[in-house]
Structures are given as structure tokens and as C-alpha cells.
Amino acid sequence: MGKVKVGINGFGRIGRLVTRAAFNSGKVDIVAINDPFIDLNYMVYMFQYDSTHGKFHGTVKAENGKLVINGNPITIFQERDPSKIKWGDAGAEYVVESTGVFTTMEKAGAHLQGGAKRVIISAPSADAPMFVMGVNHEKYDNSLKIVSNASCTTNCLAPLAKVIHDNFGIVEGLMTTVHAITATQKTVDGPSGKLWRDGRGALQNIIPASTGAAKAVGKVIPELNGKLTGMAFRVPTANVSVVDLTCRLEKAAKYDDIKKVVKQASEGPLKGILGYTEHQVVSSDLNSDTHSSTFDAGAGIALNDHFVKLISWYDNEFGYSNRVVDLMAHMASKE
């Protein structure tokens, strides 16, 4: 079949960057966007200008009630209820559910009522099967109508954990992600439901936070189920995060052995997903990087041959958005 036709629900950070990734890569066609809070002219502006990734290198305009990107007209909907979006009329076969609101099978399933064939949730899901490109995407089969692309942090951790586990065996591990701020945080102190710390000013604080990313690795690599957990520190940077995986190895390994297998994976089966660098990089050097995870060979340390701390960077917005596109292209190849 030709390129799969895609609708985007929620034109926020991920919705816009999945759209950019789709146009950059040419792997899927964006044919429709739904967002009840952003009108057409505002969409043009928000897509064109981006404080983090810079101006869109292409053309974008409003014409005849449609958003036209690089000459491609995109149908715009403004429905609040996902079951009322006429995806079928717009020709959208797959829908990226990127509002962050409809993350369960039941809620995301509403898109199927409007004619979509499949839904890809751009967030972890309580009950939808999760796929991480390069790790368990081969397990996808086309009986599945609703899937999750997991979280950006799981996409960073899982490829690294897979390589380490396949080569040396992970007995147990703890992950910390030093994570850039996201839209759910507050610019200054404000109220925040159950987790009071999450409501503190994002620009002023290092904020300890929870993340299900490490436990989720056990869902995509079943042999690691119950062997990994972790937490996050939200820090005052706009984008790019870093995973610190501290783990006990079954087989003895010198740090150079670890570097070698990660480098091999980055040039072989995980090319484009897992990167490898020996450069003295800092977070901003990874801005707009398309990898899920970039192993920092110079930053990790070994206490001994069985206990290591491994460091891997990720552009939590753009790397992830590119994997959403890759997952859809993979799913389309199975139709």
C-alpha cells in the first residue's frame, strides 16, 4: 500500500512535532487535524514558529478553510468529543491521539466511531498495548486497533536496557531521568491536585517527580518485568532530558565492553533509534535530535564489573515524535 493517511487529535507540542516529523521524513501523510482550542489561523502561526526547534523549513498557510503545509491541504476539525470527528470523511486511516486526555482503550476507541481504522496514543496507556520501536515493535500484529507508543522516557531507556540485557543480563536496576519541563508544569507556584510538588514553579526548582517509564520497560521487555523502577527530577530547561540507568549485571563486563556493544547496536539493528557519542556533549547539543536515545560513552561510570551507571540523552519532544511516525509506518507495512 501507499503511505498511510493520518489524522492528529490535539495540536500541542507532540501533535505539532509529529506533523513536522511526518513532513520531514515523508513516511506518512497528514490529512486531518482536530483541536477545539486552536482555530485555523492560529494553527498556521503555531506550526510555523517554535521556540524550541525553530521556524518550520517549508511553507504553511490557511487556504479555503484548510491548513496547507508544503502545498498539502489538511482538513481541520474543532470537535471536543472524539467520537464526533469525521476522520473517515477526511480520509484519515490512523489517528494520533496526542491530547494527553484520551489515553485508555475505551476513550481512544472513540476515534474509531468517526471512521479511523487505528489509533496510536502518544503517551503511556493503562490498558493499550505499548510498543517501542527497536525493542518490541515486531510483536505488533494487525488485529490491534489501539496501541500506545509509550513515553519519551521509556523510548530512551528501553533500547539501552535491551542492549545491556541481551549482552550481559540485568539483575536489577534503578533509573533516574533528569527531565526538561513540560506543558503540565506551572510557570510559578500554583495548585496541583494530589502531587503538591508538581505545582511548584518550573523555572525556579529542581522538582522530584514520579515516572512510570522504568516499570513500563517491563511491559515491552517481559524478561525485565519487576527488575526496573525509577523516578524523575524536573529541571528548568526547555527541552532535552537524560536517563541515568544504574544496574547490576549478571555477566561481568568492563566499561569498554559495554561501550562496544552499544556502539555496535547503534550502527546495526538500532540505527536511527539508539545513538552513540564519545563527544563532550551537553543537553542543548541534542536539541532536535531524532534518536530515541543517545548513549553518552564518556559520562557513564563502572563501580566494578557487575555494577554500572549508564547515561543516555534524548530530545523528549522530537525524538519521540519521530518514533510515533516510525510506528505508524511499521503498522502500515503490516496491513
From Swiss-Prot:
The modification S-nitrosocysteine is found at residues 152, 247. One of its GO terms (biological process) is positive regulation of canonical NF-kappaB signal transduction. The modification S-(2-succinyl)cysteine is found at residues 152, 247. Residues 1-148 are annotated as: Interaction with WARS1. D-glyceraldehyde 3-phosphate binds at residues 151-153, 182, 211-212, 234. SMART domains: Gp_dh_N (SM00846). NAD(+) binds at residues 13-14, 35, 80, 122, 316. There is a cross-link at residue 186 (Glycyl lysine isopeptide (Lys-Gly) (interchain with G-Cter in SUMO2)). The keyword Cytoplasm applies. Keywords: Acetylation, ADP-ribosylation, Apoptosis, Cytoplasm, Cytoskeleton, Glycolysis, Immunity, Innate immunity, Isopeptide bond, Methylation, NAD, Nucleus, Oxidoreductase, Phosphoprotein, S-nitrosylation, Transferase, Translation regulation, Ubl conjugation. It catalyses: D-glyceraldehyde 3-phosphate + phosphate + NAD(+) = (2R)-3-phospho-glyceroyl phosphate + NADH + H(+); S-nitroso-L-cysteinyl-[GAPDH] + L-cysteinyl-[protein] = L-cysteinyl-[GAPDH] + S-nitroso-L-cysteinyl-[protein]. Belongs to the glyceraldehyde-3-phosphate dehydrogenase family. Homotetramer. Interacts with TPPP; the interaction is direct. Interacts (when S-nitrosylated) with SIAH1; leading to nuclear translocation. Interacts with RILPL1/GOSPEL, leading to prevent the interaction between GAPDH and SIAH1 and prevent nuclear translocation. Interacts with CHP1; the interaction increases the binding of CHP1 with microtubules. Associates with microtubules. Interacts with EIF1AD, USP25, PRKCI and WARS1. Interacts with phosphorylated RPL13A; inhibited by oxidatively-modified low-densitity lipoprotein (LDL(ox)). Component of the GAIT complex. Has both glyceraldehyde-3-phosphate dehydrogenase and nitrosylase activities, thereby playing a role in glycolysis and nuclear functions, respectively. Glyceraldehyde-3-phosphate dehydrogenase is a key enzyme in glycolysis that catalyzes the first step of the pathway by converting D-glyceraldehyde 3-phosphate (G3P) into 3-phospho-D-glyceroyl phosphate. Modulates the organization and assembly of the cytoskeleton. Facilitates the CHP1-dependent microtubule and membrane associations through its ability to stimulate the binding of CHP1 to microtubules. The [IL]-x-C-x-x-[DE] motif is a proposed target motif for cysteine S-nitrosylation mediated by the iNOS-S100A8/A9 transnitrosylase complex. This is Glyceraldehyde-3-phosphate dehydrogenase. It comes from Pongo abelii (Sumatran orangutan). The gene is GAPDH.
